[in-house]
Amino acid sequence: MKVFLIGANGQIGQRLVSLFQDNPDHSIRAMVRKEEQKASLEAAGAEAVLANLEGSPEEIAAAAKGCDAIIFTAGSGGSTGYDKTLLVDLDGAAKAIEAAAIAGIKRFIMVSALQAHNRENWNEALKPYYVAKHYADKILEASGLTYTIIRPGGLRNEPGTGTVSAAKDLERGFISRDDVAKTVIASLDEKNTENRAFDLTEGDTPIAEALKKL
């Protein structure tokens, strides 16, 4: 399967590029905003193409054409204002979803945020971020694409364990970025994740088994 990765320079995106390098079943095309970002991704075994989430859906669709699935891990990051959260986490995601339809790509995996579907559990200090994730997820669910929405808990940089908790509702928890990336790739091949959204935290269940039990 040829996978189009949006957010390849982010922390989860970089882990995905590394994991795809050793995966014989999938190849990766990574979207970047700047020409100088291409070299490191190509050195890691990815095809790299230029496109911008603040551009048009048609621009993104042209970059993604010929791929079989889109993985969206992009985010504005904690150092930017909520204007960028709106432009990247919400509008950028909406454009990527529209681009999938334009390019004829049916499979779409979104990395969202724990409890983004449940307003009662949003962190007050991060409410605009949760609003963006909530409505981006809603747009994907209504798109007609075959979607998977993964809502990870607080992200950590410790090495992954390969074991997780995955369920429709997990009120709090943390997870290694390694294990988020591994769950994304496992979801590509696990039919039971299709048209599902789930929370993801640390746990004791091997990733493949956790996805089968959703």
UniProtKB/Swiss-Prot annotation:
One GO MF term on file is: lyase activity
Q: Which keywords fit this entry according to its UniProt record?
A: Lyase
Q: Which domain of life is it from?
A: Bacteria
Q: Does the keyword Endoplasmic reticulum apply?
A: no
List of catalytic residues: Y129
Cited InterPro entries: NAD(P)-bd_dom, NAD(P)-bd_dom_sf
Expression triggers = By high salinity.
Pfam annotation, one family: NAD_binding_10
Q: Give the E.C. number(s).
A: 4.-.-.-
Q: What does the similarity note say?
A: Belongs to the NAD(P)-dependent epimerase/dehydratase family.
Protein name stated in the entry: Uncharacterized sugar epimerase YhfK
Q: What is the lineage of its organism?
A: Bacteria, Bacillati, Bacillota, Bacilli, Bacillales
